[in-house]
Amino acid sequence: MARRAAAVLLLLALGCLLGILLLCLGSGDARGPPSFKYGIVLDAGSSHTAVFIYKWPADKENDTGVVSEHSMCDVEGPGISSYSSKPPAAGKSLEHCLSQAMRDVPKEKHADTPLYLGATAGMRLLTIADPPSQTCLSAVMATLKSYPFDFGGAKILSGEEEGVFGWITANYLLENFIKRGWLGEWIQSKKKTLGAMDFGGASTQITFETSDAIEDPKNEVMLKLYGQPYKVYTHSFLCYGRDQVLKRLLSKVLQAENYQETVANPCWPTGYRKSLSLSSIYDSPCTEKERPGLPLNTTVVVSGTGNGNLCAVHVNKLFDFTSCSFSHCSFDGVFQPEVSGNFIAFSAFFYTVDFIRTVMERPVHSPSDLKDAAETICATSWNELYQKAPRLEKRLPDYCATSTFVYLLITKGYNFNNRSFPSIAFQKKAGETSIGWALGYMLNLTNMIPAQEPASHRSMLYNYWVILILLFVITTLTALLTAVYLLRRSKSSTI
């Protein structure tokens, strides 16, 4: 009996050895590390331009979960819309970052690397102020075409496109559409999508999936990604970005002070003073309707008084919370269904809350936390603020106004309450990739997200191959040792 068992174990050991041999022979055909493909997107925002370089394994182009941020470069100077009076400078401002892209993307990949530019709210405002003006964009396109990449065009994104592409980016990076299974196959993710809130320099966007009826067709976007339908609500509020809000707020303060030579600003910290020309406030379509009859070269001295309650009164005037012809509205008569699920808030949302958490050392877990933090910032003198964060000197005077605005926008505007506010994650990145519309824009233009679900397939990943080899080795050794033991036992019993 022992001999028969030993024979079976020997056969098992031989089978395992054969399996190891086959795996090793099969591995001889395996390719080495995959080569990468690259894509470049220029995010031409209202306040600045950023260049993002993405990469993905060349053999995974039609899959997901594989695109990552390879590098990024912040362009020095303002956004391209600021160069309307000197368009050639807009193109020249990009040269440093494009030279970095030449180094970051392997030379042999340059010709196959798509290059796109998307301009957002700053250019949307410029087309309002000067509809025929395309000179800035033309100058930028001429610069981009002079580089050896595969230039795919430049476009001024609509506010809704900006919102939807940001939503796609966030959910793509967090694998809320599709994810890789244990055996290397792509499977539908069971996680719910999360909403996206973007707070840029000239506009703010809110985008989220909803099962509620969307009463205004302009706010409804139907998407089909990986075979799954998504009904998405989105809206972009032009003139509600950080920089434009600050201009509009100064206009309200000047109005309240009757445009005196010296103006008290409750949204600036006590001890901070600055001389401003009216042209720096009323040079935007967002403020031109409130332009006074004074010459635009008139200078006023604005002095901070650090009054949080009065600042909130002025910030509240930026919104219209009363007009609404729908069952639910956010503000300015815009329909919005009730917010639901988790949200991710990025751009200036993140920077504002990060300032509260890191510089002011205050938690932000509820609406009252955000309100209290805003009031604390407003009550802090300029000297105290500067001692806390000297490197933020340029933005420092405006954190009182910005944090007050973010509080009112989220609570009174988007209607987050004590129950729903904790569902907001204030983040800059997902993993190592920046959250924003740029990645979603590239994925759309390169057809990296198919409408249909990818065919189910399995791939023998390296880790699984190693585990399988180890299992075969352990099984073989166990079988051989057991067989030897049984044979020795059989011989000793026959003596």
UniProtKB/Swiss-Prot annotation:
Cellular component GO terms, alphabetically?
membrane; plasma membrane
Where is the protein situated, by its record's location annotation? Membrane
- Give UniProt keywords alphabetically: ATP-binding, Calcium, Disulfide bond, Glycoprotein, Hydrolase, Magnesium, Membrane, Nucleotide-binding, Transmembrane, Transmembrane helix
- Tell me which residues bind ATP: G201, A202, S203, T204, Q205
Task: Please list the cofactors this protein needs.
Answer: Ca(2+); Mg(2+)
Transmembrane segments annotated in the record for this chain? 5-25, 466-486
- Entry's Pfam families? GDA1_CD39
Indicate the secretion signal residues. none
CDD domains on file: ASKHA_NBD_NTPDase2
According to its UniProt record, where is this protein mainly located?
Answer: membrane
Catalytic residues as annotated in Swiss-Prot or TrEMBL: E162 (proton acceptor)
Which Cys pairs are S-S linked?
Answer: C73-C97, C239-C286, C267-C311, C324-C329, C378-C400
> Key word Amino-acid biosynthesis present in the record?
no
Q: A Gene Ontology molecular-function term? A: ATP binding
Membrane topology term reads:
Multi-pass membrane protein
Residues on Cytoplasmic side: 2-4, 487-495
Q: Which residues lie on this side of the membrane: Extracellular?
A: 26-465
Protein origin, superkingdom: Eukaryota
Q: Which Gene3D superfamilies match?
A: 3.30.420.40, Exopolyphosphatase. Domain 2
Which EC numbers does the record give? 3.6.1.-
Question: Which PANTHER family does the record match to this protein?
Answer: ADENOSINE/GUANOSINE DIPHOSPHATASE, ECTONUCLEOSIDE TRIPHOSPHATE DIPHOSPHOHYDROLASE 2
Q: Per the similarity annotation, which family is this?
A: Belongs to the GDA1/CD39 NTPase family.
What protein name does the entry list?
Ectonucleoside triphosphate diphosphohydrolase 2
Gene symbol of the encoding locus: ENTPD2
